[in-house]
A protein has these predicted regions:
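Basic polyanion-binding and macromolecular-assembly surfaces
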Residues: 92-271
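Long, hydrophobic/aromatic-enriched structural stretches that serve as scaffold segments
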Residues: 1-21, 33-34
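Short active-site loop/helix that positions an aromatic residue
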Residues: 31-42
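Transmembrane alpha-helical segments of multi-pass membrane glycosylation machinery
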Residues: 81-86, 108
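Short, glycine/acidic-rich hinge or "gate" loops at secondary-structure transitions
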Residues: 41-83
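Short, conserved phosphate/pyrophosphate- and ester-handling motifs at nucleotide-, phospho-/glycolipid
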Residues: 25
Length: 271
């Protein structure tokens, strides 16, 4: 790591009881859930209009960070996923969620030699970069991660074709509303997904799919203004996001084997 290692924070990859790295099934399912939700919003925007109006109204409200917009997200997810009618009185009850029919296993253990320490690099829209004193244990590029995806067809009709189409729409939205605003950033391919805690807020949020590029920037900026702490001088690092045309105004990168790449980008193969 070099001389700076004394001041460097190292974030470890999650490991099983035997010390082997793996990806929790809950993380993979959460990623798929977000992608499927974004797909439904893009394809059926009209049915989300009321929820969108509620979200627009509530974004400016002062709430504890732990509950900020939680009711809004619950409302939006209920529209997309709660279709089982097991509890007709409470549509939002988890027993009505069709994603109960999607079971994702933890990944198979990953060889410890397939971990590499990567420094976090933040790239700005104009291409400027700066690194921060955090190293992450990351899975090496090109490593195959195996997991089992089981769909109970009696509960939901999500199949391979729907998942691939959802991923394609997700990448199109992410490329257009986010990556395109960063000089030199590589677009995601149609079968790419983004996984992991270090990949950034924009890859995990629905606001661009719901509001589009222009209004999505303002919406996400306002969310970050309400949830991210101000700097010591009282300024907020996301205040100028609207003027920059993208929010957040940072894309997460790293350098591995002399090549720069976006954090968390994976190719999804179902077979």
């Amino acid at each position: 790591i070099g001389v700076e290692s004394r001041d460097m924070e190292i974030q470890e990859h999650i490991k099983d009881p035997y010390g082997m790295p793996y990806i929790p099934g809950s993380s993979i399912k959460g990623m798929l859930r977000t992608i499927l939700l974004i797909y439904d919003i893009l394809e059926n925007s009209q049915k989300y209009q009321k929820a969108k109006n509620n979200l627009s109204y509530d974004i400016g409200k002062q709430q504890r960070r732990t509950i900020y917009l939680s009711k809004n997200m619950k409302e939006i997810e209920t529209i997309s996923f709660n279709k089982l009618n097991r509890d007709e009185k409470k549509v939002g009850n988890a027993v009505n969620d069709i994603m109960a029919g999607v079971i994702v296993s933890d990944s198979a253990s990953i060889d410890i030699k397939d971990l590499v320490l990567c420094k976090k690099i933040e790239r700005h829209p104009d291409g400027r970069e700066h690194s921060i004193n955090i190293m992450r244990e990351c899975i090496k590029p090109g490593t195959q991660i195996n997991f089992t995806l089981t769909v109970d067809e009696s509960i939901c009709n999500i199949d391979e074709q729907i998942i691939y189409e959802a991923i394609k729409k997700y990448t199109e939205c992410y490329n257009d509303c986010f990556i395109a605003l960063f000089k030199g950033a590589e677009y995601l391919q149609d079968d790419y997904v983004i996984l992991g805690g270090g990949s950034g807020f924009a890859s995990k949020t629905i606001e661009y799919s719901m509001y589009g590029k222009k209004d999505g920037v303002k919406c996400i900026r306002d969310i970050l203004l309400n949830t991210v702490k101000r700097e010591k001088n009282g300024n907020h690092k996301n205040y100028k996001d609207a003027a920059l045309g993208v929010s957040p105004h940072i894309i997460k990168y790293t350098s591995c084997y002399g090549k720069q790449m976006q954090m968390g980008v994976c190719k999804m193969i179902i077979k």
